[in-house]
Structures are given as structure tokens and as C-alpha cells.
A protein has these predicted regions:
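One-carbon transfer enzymes
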Residues: 1-109
Length: 109
């Protein structure tokens, strides 16, 4: 099954790791853009990006998923399922309808 994973914080890392360890085909990982953090405002990648890169997965960091560019990327990945875990953005209808088996969302709140 071709899975696109969408997540950002530490909370989402275990889900990504579990999908990977389960042998699922993760065709792309979407996460929020790197952002300045701390007193020195050092540009810092989200935890999901760090994990995905360690696993050798392709990472996408669009500022918005509501652009034609982001939609085109998702279409090209041809996902069967999109797994969303604390991504931090509301997905538009076009994305929700894209995968063959739909989207699954988990959030800590």
C-alpha cells in the first residue's frame, strides 16, 4: 500500500516509525517548514523531518497544502492512503478525496 505520511511534532514520530517498521511503502512525508527556534532563532527542522531523513524517506515541506504545487506533488505520489498525525493544517477536499482508501487522522487533542 502506497502511503503518504503527514505530521510535524514529536507526537507524530512514533506513528511514522511504526508504519516504516511495519513494512509499509511510505512514498512521501509532508511536514511543516523548518522554523527559527530558541533565543538565537536557529532554523530547526520538525521532528518528523529528522526521523524521515534518517529513514531515507522523501520529505516535502510546503508552506501550504492548498496550492496547486502541493496538490500536484500528492497526485504524482499516487497514494492509496494518507496518514495524518498532528500535521498542523486542515487538508482541503481535493486532498481528502485523492487516496484510494481515504485519509486517517490522529491528533493528541
Amino acid at each position: 500500500m502506497r502511503i503518504v505520511f503527514m505530521g510535524t511534532p514529536d507526537f507524530a514520530v512514533n506513528a511514522l516509525q511504526s508504519l516504516y517498521d511495519g513494512g509499509h511503502e511510505i512514498v512521501g512525508v509532508f511536514t511543516q517548514p523548518d522554523k527559527p527556534q530558541g533565543r538565537k532563532m536557529v532554523l530547526t527542522p520538525p521532528p518528523v523531518k529528522v526521523c524521515a531523513e534518517k529513514l531515507g524517506l522523501t520529505v516535502y515541506q510546503p508552506k501550504s497544502v492548498k496550492t496547486s504545487e502541493a496538490l500536484d506533488i500528492l497526485k504524482s505520489l499516487n497514494p492509496d492512503l494518507i496518514a495524518v498525525v498532528a500535521y498542523g493544517k486542515i487538508l482541503p477536499k481535493e486532498i481528502l478525496e485523492l487516496p484510494k482508501f481515504g485519509c486517517v487522522n490522529a491528533h493528541a487533542s
